[in-house]
Each structure stands twice: as structure tokens, then as C-alpha cells.
Amino acid sequence: MPSFDIVSEVDFVEVRNAVDNSARELKTRFDFKNVEASITFDKEIVKITTESDFQLTQLVSILRGNLAKREVDAQSMTQKDTVRTGKAWACNVEFKQGIESDTAKKVVKTIKDAKLKVQASIQGEKVRVTAKKRDDLQAAMALVRNNEELGQPFQFDNFRD
């Protein structure tokens, strides 16, 4: 029986490239001239520090733009609370890796509510979908890809015929 896995993974090489491009753009932007601002990447976390809250939001939008250019979905990005220490504003940005159990249950429920002729089962941090026909699998892929309520980007791999 044909099957595939639904996963949610981020390519951290592309994230590092986007952070490097953002740091390069930070050096050349006029609104960041004579400003202490930095963006660094370390172990799946991007740390952003600036002198003001406005500059922090600008730097996050620069990062989002560079992530989009590198084809990393911005939905996988989670911005943590902004912290002010002295005259510096700091923010950590984390990336969702894997499918959490609540989200996996929503994916399975969405597929079952659509009344497609497929079976979906949770296997750790991924969801396996099996069906008798490849067309049913493609319908399930389109359903998951177009569902905005899940709030997470998904990739499909491990296709079997």
C-alpha cells in the first residue's frame, strides 16, 4: 500500500545563511548606522540584540525576509519575549522542529474529518499516512498543505508504493 510521512523540519544550514545575510544587511543599512545591534545563530536559536524596540522589530523583519529568500517557512519561527537589559533590547528566535503531539492529533483529525480513504497514524514526531491509491494520498497532502489552522509548515517524505 502506498504511504508517506508528514514531518516538520527546518534546514539549519539555510537558517545560518539567512542569519549571515541579515548580519551583512545590518552593516549596510542606514537606519542601523552608529547603533549597537547584532544577530547571531547558536544551536537552533537566533539571538537578536539592539538599542531600541523599533530596531528590534526591524531586525526581525529583515530576518523574516532573508528566511523567505532561503525558502525557510516563517511559520516555523517562534519569537520569544523581548527582554530589556540596561540600554539593550534582546530577543531569542527559535524554530519548531518535529511535530508536537497536539499538532499531530490535529493533523490526524483533519484528515479523518475530510472522509478521505486514507489511514493516518502518529509515529513519534511524524504522521504516517497510508492508502490504497496514490490519488487519495495526494488529496491528503493537499488538505494538510492548505490547512491554515495547523500553524506549522509540513514536508512530505518517505514515499512508498
Curated annotation (Swiss-Prot):
GO terms for molecular function: nucleotide binding. Pfam families: DUF520. Keywords: Nucleotide-binding. InterPro entries: DUF520, UPF0234-like_C, UPF0234_N, YajQ-like_sf. GO terms for cellular component: cytosol. Transmembrane segments: none annotated. Nucleotide-binding protein. Belongs to the YajQ family. NCBIfam families: PRK05412.1. This is Nucleotide-binding protein PBPRA2024. It comes from Photobacterium profundum (strain SS9).
